[in-house]
């Protein structure tokens, strides 16, 4: 394939990637967006395989077969509720790919056309060192995020004295090693840089609590994009640079939007220490010296069947219990009774960007019934019932009333303004932010203690 034809194919693939991002921004066009991304990637892979510089086809076919087999198994086995940790795992692979490509270029620069051993082009040294640093941070940070999301590591922040000064010192040392390697091509500086970047990725993510996981996933997505762009520079592949820049910039923009939705700066999230695990009070009982009103599935069924407008607020509890299908079934029963049903989604509900949207889409919930915070918040005051299923911190009125609360200033869903709040929860445990939800003790709140899926199924049975 000629160079001109290769560049033309890369441009087509790049345009398809941009259109894919545009399509994925809306649930109704997400399938088409996915298809365009797949076609773009197919064009990119075929074009690269037809490049004159590609010779070891046997190794490439073997790698594709192994990767394809693993991907097929993952697609069939992994549940929709496990998508956040799957995304984190994929980010780690991109980071490690950047590390391996940079290392391969250092050890065999002739194969990459960037010079010879001891005489690598200055620009390539800078590209390699940046790709290595970002890739290593992405890898170790994503591994920690995966561990937290999978429950292998405690979701609460892990902090220790002088943590931030240590990170600052390591950051400065990282920059120094970058400069030293770029100036001297020292293998010692390179591998020291690699170890330091791995350590920094670990130290940056370990103090971040579960409440910030959606932002962390988005941030790591951005890192993986820049790592891919670094690989593109090392390999001299313009499409990889374009794709990496698209992922990196979109991830950064999404991180900013989500931080804005939490009324927090990205620097607060990176510094960590927010999102501790809360204690547990007895289900159906009192938290401290305050009591709550507990109800049954029959109570909830009676209240909702006699309502005219119900707003459903899904959260991480729905994801854990895999209650999305039972929830849609309940909504269908309500609609048959003439009840107006809609869904309210908080931008940081769940453990990754769009987590609730993905689960509701899997349950075939109509897109026109799903609304973001800004679109639906004013509707709670006219709703007869707000049905909250495992959405804790994002419904806590303390975010508006208690300046001492760690979530103070975070925009919340105004569920307390509904006529009745039905709140499904396993116990009186606080959310990932580690603060008690004042909503539990409101006069118009009825707690429904139990597994979200089982409770919803019992409500459906009671309605029938």
Swiss-Prot record:
InterPro entries: DHS-like_NAD/FAD-binding_dom, NADH_DH_b, PNTB-like
GO molecular function: NADP binding; proton-translocating NAD(P)+ transhydrogenase activity
Binding positions (NADP(+)): 316-317, 348-353, 390-394, 425-432, 451-452
GO cellular component, one term: plasma membrane
Membrane topology value: Multi-pass membrane protein
Transmembrane domains' residue ranges: 54-74, 86-106, 126-146, 164-184, 191-211, 227-247
Catalytic activity line of the entry: NAD(+) + NADPH + H(+)(in) = NADH + NADP(+) + H(+)(out)
SUPFAM superfamilies reported for this sequence: DHS-like NAD/FAD-binding domain
EC id: 7.1.1.1
Pfam families named in the record: PNTB
Alphabetical UniProt keywords: Cell inner membrane, Cell membrane, Membrane, NAD, NADP, Nucleotide-binding, Translocase, Transmembrane, Transmembrane helix
Compartment(s) where it occurs, according to its Swiss-Prot or TrEMBL record: Cell inner membrane
Self-association state and partner proteins as the record states: Complex of an alpha and a beta chain; in Rhodospirillum, the alpha chain seems to be made of two subunits.
Function: The transhydrogenation between NADH and NADP is coupled to respiration and ATP hydrolysis and functions as a proton pump across the membrane.
Entry's family note: Belongs to the PNT beta subunit family.
Name of the protein in its database record: NAD(P) transhydrogenase subunit beta
Species assigned in the record: Rhodospirillum rubrum (strain ATCC 11170 / ATH 1.1.1 / DSM 467 / LMG 4362 / NCIMB 8255 / S1)
């Amino acid at each position: 394939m000629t160079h001109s034809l290769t560049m033309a194919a890369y441009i087509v693939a790049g345009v398809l990637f941009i259109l894919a991002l545009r399509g994925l921004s809306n649930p109704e066009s997400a399938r088409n967006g996915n298809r365009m991304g797949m076609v773009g990637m197919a064009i990119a892979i075929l074009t690269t395989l037809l490049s004159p510089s590609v010779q070891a086809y046997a190794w490439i076919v073997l790698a594709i077969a192994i990767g394809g087999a693993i991907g097929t198994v993952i697609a069939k086995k992994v549940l929709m509720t496990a998508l956040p940790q799957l995304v984190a795992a994929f980010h780690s692979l991109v980071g490690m790919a950047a590390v391996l490509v940079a290392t391969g270029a250092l050890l065999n620069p002739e194969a990459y056309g960037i010079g010879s051993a001891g005489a690598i082009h200055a620009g390539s040294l800078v590209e390699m060192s940046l790709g290595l640093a970002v890739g290593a941070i992405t890898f170790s940070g994503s591994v920690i995020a995966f561990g937290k999301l999978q429950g292998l590591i405690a979701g609460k922040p892990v902090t220790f004295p002088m943590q931030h000064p240590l990170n600052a010192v390591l950051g400065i040392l990282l920059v120094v090693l970058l400069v030293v390697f770029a100036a001297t091509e020292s293998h010692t500086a390179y591998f020291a840089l690699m170890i330091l970047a791995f350590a920094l990725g670990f130290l940056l993510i370990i103090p971040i609590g579960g409440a910030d996981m959606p932002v962390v996933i988005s941030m790591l997505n951005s890192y993986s994009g820049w790592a891919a762009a670094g690989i593109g520079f090392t390999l001299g592949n313009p499409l990889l640079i374009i794709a990496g820049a698209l992922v990196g910039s979109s991830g950064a923009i999404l991180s900013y939007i989500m931080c804005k939705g939490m009324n927090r700066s990205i620097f607060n999230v990176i510094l960590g220490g927010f999102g501790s695990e809360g204690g547990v009070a007895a289900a159906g009982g009192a938290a401290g010296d305050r009591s709550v009103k507990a109800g049954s599935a029959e109570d909830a069924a009676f209240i909702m069947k006699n309502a005219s407008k119900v707003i459903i607020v899904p959260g991480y509890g729905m994801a854990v219990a895999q209650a999305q299908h039972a929830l849609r079934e309940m909504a269908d029963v309500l609609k048959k009774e003439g009840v107006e049903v809609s869904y309210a989604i908080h931008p940081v509900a769940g453990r990754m960007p769009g987590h609730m949207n993905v689960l509701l889409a899997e349950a075939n919930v109509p897109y026109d019934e799903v609304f973001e915070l800004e679109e639906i918040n004013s509707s709670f005051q006219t709703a007869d019932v707000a049905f909250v299923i495992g959405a804790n911190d994002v419904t806590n009125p303390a975010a508006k009333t208690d300046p001492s609360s760690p979530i103070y200033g975070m925009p919340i869903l105004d569920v307390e303004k509904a006529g009745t709040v039905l709140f499904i929860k396993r116990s009186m445990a606080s959310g990932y932010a580690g603060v008690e939800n004042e909503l539990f003790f409101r006069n118009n709140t009825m707690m429904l203690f139990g597994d979200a899926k089982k409770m919803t199924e019992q409500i459906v049975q009671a309605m029938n």
